Each structure stands twice: as C-alpha cells, then as structure tokens.
Amino acid sequence: MSYDRAITVFSPDGHLFQVEYAQEAVKKGSTAVGVRGRDIVVLGVEKKSVAKLQDERTVRKICALDDNVCMAFAGLTADARIVINRARVECQSHRLTVEDPVTVEYITRYIASLKQRYTQSNGRRPFGISALIVGFDFDGTPRLYQTDPSGTYHAWKANAIGRGAKSVREFLEKNYTDEAIETDDLTIKLVIKALLEVVQSGGKNIELAVMRRDQSLKILNPEEIEKYVAEIEKEKEENEKKKQKKAS
C-alpha cells in the first residue's frame, strides 16, 4: 500500500507521511525568529530578494491577527494566507462574543486545531506552514508560541522556524539570557544577531516587527534595522580588539 499518498493512513512504523512532507516544506521556507522579552516581543524574518519590478510590500511574512497578537510563518505563503484569514475572523468573532481580545494561547490553540483537522480528513492535505505567534495577554504578560503542520503547539522563550532554524536555535540556546533581554533594544539586537547567522547580506534582507505592551504591532523600516546592524558590527569589532589585547 502507498502510505505516502493517503493522508489519514499510518504507515506500519507509525508515520503519517503527508504530515512529514508538510514539515519538509517548512524547512525549505524563509527563516523566522521570535524572542520574548520583558516588555516586548520581537519577530524577525529572512527576507528573500524580490524581482526588480515587484512591489516588496506584497511579500510579507509577518502580519497582525489582532491588536494584541501577531504571527510570522515559514513555508507555503498561499497556505499561510488561509490560516491567517481564519485566525483573524476568529479574533473578531471572539471580540464580538466576549467583548475582550483573545489571549495568545487561545488563538494559537485555534490555529493548531485547524491544522490538526487537515491531517485527519479526506480530500484535504496538511498546511505546509509553521507559525510563530506572539503577543500580550490582558495582564500584560508577553507570550511566544510555535505551531507546526501536525497541529502541535508549544510555548517558548525564543525559537526559530524555517530553513536555518537549527543553527539559529543553537545560537539562541547559547545567547538567550536574562541580561540579553534586559531592555527592548537588547531584545531586538538578539533577534537580528540570530538572523545574521543565516542571512548573508546584512540588514537589507531582514524584516523585523516589534510589539510592546499596550501598543500595536510596529514593522521596523530598513533604516532602523541598518542602524541596529551597524551597532552590532561595532560591538563585534570592539570585542575583537579586547581579545587581541588580552592575547598580546
């Protein structure tokens, strides 16, 4: 039997191949990084080069779901559009029904449940995306969650998805400390440093968004990102000089 063709049939060794293939699609997507700070959440995405005549504003990997929640994704953009639209409708429906915005976990659970349903029904295929979902709850607590094509979700302090996820995650495991997220600027720099592990041409290929407590999503413009990149490069040079002095 061809187990890799049927979505709802397990292989003898317990695999759902269509779900695993969807996870492979995620690994080919642009790298996305999320970091939860003290009073800020930051999303960063590797920005692929666009055609000369293409309007780059139409190629967005970070989007708001509600005033207090946003997400970045890696994988198939067309699949992400469906998930984003469904999540936005759910956020609005929740506001109308309960008269309160959604919690970050609520909308993450909704997205994860939507993905899971597409792994268990005929005539559909799994969504080929992973998502990093960030935001603030009513009490001002910052949150970061990650979902994958199988419908599982987890809370994180910092995480990465996409083609460079492994090396970026290793960087974050080494460098994520209480000191590294002490201020908003330090948290933003941590995300940029993590992305620079896989992005070759500096700040021009990075898309960055920040959300602060009681403030809506802000997409940083290229000049702001370049300013942070220049500061990071300067810090690197100073550290190298200090090392050379110690060695001599």
Curated annotation (Swiss-Prot):
Keywords for this protein: Acetylation, Cytoplasm, Glycoprotein, Host-virus interaction, Nucleus, Phosphoprotein, Proteasome
GO cellular component: cytoplasm; cytosol; extracellular exosome; nucleoplasm; nucleus; proteasome complex; proteasome core complex; proteasome core complex, alpha-subunit complex
Molecular function in Gene Ontology: identical protein binding
Family annotation (CDD domains): proteasome_alpha_type_7
Name of one Pfam family that matches: Proteasome
PANTHER family attached to this UniProt entry: PROTEASOME SUBUNIT ALPHA/BETA
Protein family per UniProt: Belongs to the peptidase T1A family.
Subunit structure: The 26S proteasome consists of a 20S proteasome core and two 19S regulatory subunits. The 20S proteasome core is a barrel-shaped complex made of 28 subunits that are arranged in four stacked rings. The two outer rings are each formed by seven alpha subunits, and the two inner rings are formed by seven beta subunits. The proteolytic activity is exerted by three beta-subunits PSMB5, PSMB6 and PSMB7. PSMA7 interacts directly with the PSMG1-PSMG2 heterodimer which promotes 20S proteasome assembly. Interacts with HIF1A. Interacts with RAB7A. Interacts with PRKN. Interacts with ABL1 and ABL2. (Microbial infection) Interacts with HIV-1 TAT protein.
UniProt protein name: Proteasome subunit alpha type-7
Organism from which the protein derives: Homo sapiens
Source taxonomy: Eukaryota, Metazoa, Chordata, Craniata, Vertebrata
